[in-house]
Amino acid sequence: TAGAEVASRLAEAGIHVVVFEMNPRPYGKIEDGLPRWHEGLRAKEYETIREKLGHAGVDYVPNTKIGRDVSFQELANDWGFSAVILANGAWRDRPLPVEGADQYVGKGLIYQNPFIIWFNHCDEKNYAGERFVPEDGALVVGGGLASIDVAKVHMLETTRARLRARGIEQDMIELEVKGIPKSLEKHGLTWEELG
């Protein structure tokens, strides 16, 4: 979304813009960084990005990674661009600013991006990415909307796991929309009984 915003503003000012995107689609963190229950927000953001990149003065080039497919040197010196603007968004988690923390990645420390990507795809038959098993006693570090989403995913997934252990399959979207207490009530359960 960062690149689409910059491209749109420059194009509106009459500047021809080329947007290089390393992924097949231009949606960045909106595509896999939002938990799947944010369907309405995701659709709205997709449309906004399509509009911005659809401006007459914008050329969009997907599947092109700077440094792999084209060098920064080439862009800056050989392609005739008057400027190269790096608007690389939030596709990578910021590391936890605690010395030695990263040695625990894969041993209990889980960053938001891989966790939400797993959550968004874990019910797909062909999902081959990293897998997580949310358990009781987790700590979510952060104070923004992403940390709220992570805490919510954790709560929803631990609830679904406990229901599955009782032979009950529960649709995640329904669980999120109706809320855990009402969903449990539908199955004749309470928080206390679920454990």
Q: For the regions a protein language model found, what residue spans apply to each?
A:
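Glycine-rich dinucleotide-binding loop and its adjacent helix/turn
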Residues: D93-L194
